[in-house]
Amino acid sequence: PYMQQWLGYAQKYSKDGLLRQWPSTEYRNWYLGDWATPVGIDQTNPASIDVVNNSFMVTCYQTMAKIAKVLGKDQDIQPFVEKAEELEQLIHKTFYDPKQKSYSTGTQIDLIYPMLVGATPKEELPDVQNTLFAVTADRFKGHLSAGLVGVPVITEWAVKNRQADFMYSMLKKREYPGYLYMLDNGATTTWEHWNGERSHIHNCYNGIGLWFYQALGGILPDENEPGYKHVFIQPQLVESLTWVKIRLMDF
């Protein structure tokens, strides 16, 4: 019930089927998209915030359908599936620019999130993916350029689409922004911001961890056998890496 109530709250602030700005608190505006992005990316741009949040809503509906299945509430499955599909179509219709082959502001998360949740039609996927590669190379100089929301989204997409070389090419960059930039500047834990502002022990960018054991290590969970009772071993090889060592501790 609580998850359904939260979805009801989100729907309360939806207009024409799309989630829009909801009320701020005295502390701050909590209708955020990506957060703690590198300098030069406007995380306050409404177009980016809306495509990110509505893509997240698709994830919520898809997850609720899975939960309903696990709980044996078969009557709830199809309504959530339909809501997810309806929102997928709205996202593409509203935020996609067919001339630019791009979504919203064209940042990495704006391009990847719709692809990840299934909002991008199959026939458009190659074009959007090529836009992503071009934007990463030209606008972002080959760097992973996202915040705490974008990093796990990009990571999940890279794992599912076996884009190990693309991800590795970004991770090995030593200049700002990047993980090696942190290490080269004395970091022993991940920072709150890519440039080192504020906290130097934060969980903002830890979503990258998934890539190491699911892509390089290739240990993928089986949703039909939860709790790692059954796994798939499908390592994604990167040409310039000579070895990877990984182990899974299950309980």
Regions found by a protein language model. Give the residues of each.
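Repeat-solenoid scaffold signature
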Residues: R139-N185
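Amphipathic alpha-helical segments of tetratricopeptide repeats
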Residues: A65, H92-K93, A134-A137, Y176
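Alpha-helical repeat scaffolds
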Residues: E124-T136
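Well-ordered alpha-helical scaffold segments within catalytic/enzyme domains
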Residues: P1, S55-D74, I112-E123, V153-N161, ...
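Non-catalytic C-terminal accessory modules of carbohydrate-active enzymes
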Residues: V81-E82, D165-F251
